Amino acid sequence: MQNTAKKATLPATALAALGVVFGDIGTSPLYALKESFHAAHGLGIQPENVLGILSIIFWCLMLIISIKYVAIVMRADNNGEGGIMALLALNLRKAKIADNKKIYMIAIGFIGASLFFGDGIITPAISVLSAVEGLSIATDVFDPFIMPIAIAIIVTLFLVQKHGTAFVGKFFGPITLVWFLSLGILGIHSVIQTPVVLGMFSPHWAIQFIYHHPIMTFFVMGAVVLTVTGGEALYADMGHFGPVPIRLAWFFVVLPCLVLNYAGQGALLLRDPAAIENPFYLLVPQWALYPMIIMATMATVIASQAVISGVFSLARQAIQLGYLPRLSIKHTSESEEGQIYVPFLNWLLLIAIIILILIFKTSSNLASAYGLAVTLTMLCDTILVAVFIYSAWKWSLPKVLLLIIPFFILESVLVGATSLKILSGGWVPLLIGAIAVTILMTWKRGRELTFAKLEHDTLSLDLFVKSIGNSVHWVPGDAVFMTGTPNVVPHAMLHNIKHNKVLHQRNILVTVVIEDVPFVAPEERITTETLAEHFFRIKIFYGFKDEMNVPKALLQAYEQLGLEYDLMHISFFISRDRIVHSVGDGMSPWREKLFISMQRNTSPVSDFYQIPTNRVVELGSQIEI
């Protein structure tokens, strides 16, 4: 019966995956082929060039998406979860690499994650602009309004984020299915008129194009890469839908419809080279133009929503793994744990997208900024997957290299091709990536220095417990001390003794530990230890995708210790650390200032761990790093 249920839900899950996983790659036909014949390339629209570029597009889709991501990368899962942060956490756990060498792997993961943040800015801008630009095909009247309409759509999209997308999300899959079927039908209609375009499936057209235009190929590849945007999404969303529905949707709906549409656009160019102005919308019959513009706008909004949700999810993973400062995270759905809203990131993305639209003005101009982010992220994935295959699958090094080198070479060529556009827009993802990497690395290093200082300067907990005796006054109730260093006395406890001259009858030291897995089983959530008559140590283990609720976890811990649990009789003591600069080894002064600024603006511990505010006592302390 269970297998039957699974089979029954598989098509439904694949349909849901369409609206989340494939929105980005599904909107590429709006601009990708047009950019391949950009006037700056000086490439004539002759049949051999059209077939050559179409062949390159087809084989890039097959090699990068079908083989690399669908067949290989999606097997590198972290307890069912995918995405570059999950892969990094998995490699840090599995790979036998010296600690001083792990920094290089962390850096690669950080670069890939940072570029994905950049993708969250560029994708909504280029997608929505390219959809709205269809209005200029219908009439010139709309030309002055294209940018304002695009910005209005983007603003509306971000305004509704705080309300969640649980309700409208039900329609994303069906709408995206209609979109893909529309792509396929438009393509078939055009291919029937010019069937010679089907020669694109033969690799000899791609090889011939590369042979006759080696330098031009390099420039063209910078635009062809736009056809494989969103490959990372297949992997990143694997934990939400599972690999089988994603593969099913790709091979039976997405890939055929994309290929047919690119073939249809190519067939149109063979019939009418002037259609290069906008081959996607000129493929559409005049009577269907406005409905198609509406459909394209909905598809691009859905694609943008998927990327925004992906950025929120990635940020939460980075926060829980200790790579980003605590940010306020709101849950927008009672039934879907993954539906979250990060206010700070929401407004940051909105402002950045509007600035991007105002600077670049058209989707063609933005295409230069888009490609570099995509190719560098792919290259980071390839390197981390190679480490995974070597360490987790125990493949020999020659075998790993034989599998990975072809992808590495192809993606290195794509990186090189898109790097030529740094001055015309490629600087955008590089700038965003550099800022994000700096933040990630600075926060990670700052935390390491802070914890090292706490370990060094604070009393040993075991020594303190043995020596405390009756030298303090004991008061009724429970005191929970949140601490990141479980083997030393928390600053908050020392300050409580110093200022209040008391300790509670039960003093419970709680440390939250984030594991390198997405979820921790409930039975493995808690470890408890009785240190002495009045002292207990509790460790709460979470995965990097778990929702953290300390009061709920404490109930389980109290049961293990055989203690009576009453939240209204528990005081949570939290140390509010004030980080100050000190002379000596550590970070450069500007990084210390950045870390101190981030530390001061973190979300309160009580909010992050869902501790009732009226049960919290905050005590300040100063730490020099």
Swiss-Prot record:
Keywords: Cell inner membrane, Cell membrane, Ion transport, Membrane, Potassium, Potassium transport, Symport, Transmembrane, Transmembrane helix, Transport. It is found in: Cell inner membrane. Its main location: membrane. GO terms for cellular component: plasma membrane. It is a multi-pass membrane protein. The keyword Transport applies. It catalyses: K(+)(in) + H(+)(in) = K(+)(out) + H(+)(out). The chain crosses the membrane at residues 13-33, 53-73, 103-123, 141-161, 172-192, 206-226, 250-270, 282-302, 340-360, 369-389, 400-420, 422-442. GO terms for molecular function: potassium ion transmembrane transporter activity; symporter activity. Transport of potassium into the cell. Likely operates as a K(+):H(+) symporter. Belongs to the HAK/KUP transporter (TC 2.A.72) family. This is Probable potassium transport system protein Kup.
